[in-house]
Amino acid sequence: MSNYSKVIIFIVILIVFSGAVIYLYNTESSMNEAMPDISSSIVAGDSDYNSAVDLLNDKSYNEARNKAISAENNFNQSRIQLLDIKDNFTSDTNDVHKNYINTVIKELELKINATENLLESIDYYKNYQNSTGNDYSSRANELMNEALDFQNVRNNLVRENPNLFK
């Protein structure tokens, strides 16, 4: 093999390696860039959900419904962004990051289901069907408690791996 061939092979390997490094950096970088927006949407969704519950307890059904819809929109927005990040996972994506993203997706799916049940309960209470409204409210509460378990797992992952979460 000539020196010229060796140089060509070296350059090709260098280009492939550089491309892989850039791709991995961009995947992790895009995840780090998206996380503040995702976190803000989750916090806003939690706040809207809690406001919806307070408004429901005050029998302000229309306002409760509006807040619940806002919560659901915030949770869905975060979920869509996380699914996009998950679709771009590679075999080199850190297992802690994978676990974190999957945990937050599960948390959000439960929060979305809880919000859907809360919306159903609002409709039943508004129509004076309190027993059925109570059933949906209880289910919403159960789902939100399950979501909080995932939220605690997520928070522990961040606390245990501060170097991975900037």
Residue spans of the language-model regions?
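Short, Lys/Arg-rich N-terminal segment immediately upstream of the first membrane anchor
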Residues: M1-Y4
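Hydrophobic membrane-insertion alpha-helices, especially the h-region
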Residues: K6-I22
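Short, charge-rich amphipathic alpha-helices with coiled-coil/heptad character
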Residues: F17, D46-V53, L82-S91
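Transmembrane signal-anchor/signal-peptide helices with a preference for the extracytoplasmic
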Residues: F17-D37
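C-terminal amphipathic alpha-helix
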Residues: M31-Q77, N113-K166
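Short, solvent-exposed, charged loop/turn and helix-capping segments
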Residues: N74-K106, E160-K166
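Extended, hydrophobic/aromatic-rich amphipathic alpha-helical segments that build helical scaffolds
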Residues: V104-E116
